[in-house]
């Protein structure tokens, strides 16, 4: 799947989740590519920057949409000690 196809599949689903849970905290558990798509979108990054977003396995990223404008609070945080 190419980046454009991934973006076209992911962003409408994220918008639907946000609409369904408006005003509530929500969690999306996904692989790194999906997380990169969301982060790149909210940061208005070009496709060339996609792989410059580090998203390790099991990492946490947090986007706050509370005022309708996305703010990245955490990106790619690893909260465990890798073996």
Cite the ranges covered by each PLM segment.
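Internal catalytic-core helix/loop-beta-alpha segment
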Residues: 1-21
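Glycine-rich phosphate-binding loops at beta-strand->alpha-helix junctions
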Residues: 34-38
């Amino acid at each position: 799947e190419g980046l454009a196809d991934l973006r076209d599949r992911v962003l409408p689903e994220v918008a639907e989740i946000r609409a369904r849970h408006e005003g509530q905290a929500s969690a999306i558990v996904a692989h790194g590519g999906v997380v990169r798509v969301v982060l790149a979108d909210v940061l208005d990054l070009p496709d060339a920057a996609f792989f410059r977003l580090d998203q390790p396995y099991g990492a946490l990223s947090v986007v706050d949409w509370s005022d309708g404008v996305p703010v990245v609070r955490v990106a790619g945080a690893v909260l465990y000690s890798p073996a």
